[in-house]
Amino acid sequence: MIGNWNYGTGRRKSAVARVFIKSGKGDIIVNGKPIKEYFARETSLMIVRQPLELTAHAETFDIKVNVTGGGETGQAGAVRHGITRALIDYDATLKPTLSKAGYVTRDAREVERKKVGLHKARRRKQFSKR
């Protein structure tokens, strides 16, 4: 806990989010912008709010987020992971609920590298019989 802020770091793909939460009225600021301005897609907004809605804390915290790297989906997942960790820092009794929903576990899937002689990571050149 930093002052009266609770902290959590979230990661997803190549995105990293540093999340600070404190008691408030439900404002979420991402990189200095309101969340609806920062995340254009409705699915990204839903992903970010999932741990708050699950624990019934959607209107009880002000959240400040610094997120870097990745794209919109990766950043949304990183923010969700960070909010989850910050909620656990605030109240450890929330961990079983969040863990059962799968929000505590870091999604370890990363982009597979492109291999030499292939078009993409696994896509081969088209085979010609003749």
From Swiss-Prot:
SUPFAM superfamilies with a match to the protein in the record: Ribosomal protein S5 domain 2-like
Keywords: Ribonucleoprotein, Ribosomal protein
GO molecular function: RNA binding; structural constituent of ribosome
Gene3D superfamilies from the UniProt entry: 3.30.230.10
Gene Ontology terms describing biological process: translation
GO CC terms of this entry: cytosolic small ribosomal subunit
InterPro entries: Ribosomal_Su5_D2-typ_SF, Ribosomal_uS9, Ribosomal_uS9_bac/plastid, Ribosomal_uS9_CS, Ribsml_uS5_D2-typ_fold_subgr
Entry keyword Transit peptide: no
Pfam families in alphabetical order: Ribosomal_S9
Keyword Manganese: no
Entry-linked HAMAP family: Ribosomal_uS9_B
Annotated family: Belongs to the universal ribosomal protein uS9 family.
Protein name: Small ribosomal subunit protein uS9
Species for this entry: Cupriavidus metallidurans (strain ATCC 43123 / DSM 2839 / NBRC 102507 / CH34)
Gene this chain is encoded by: rpsI
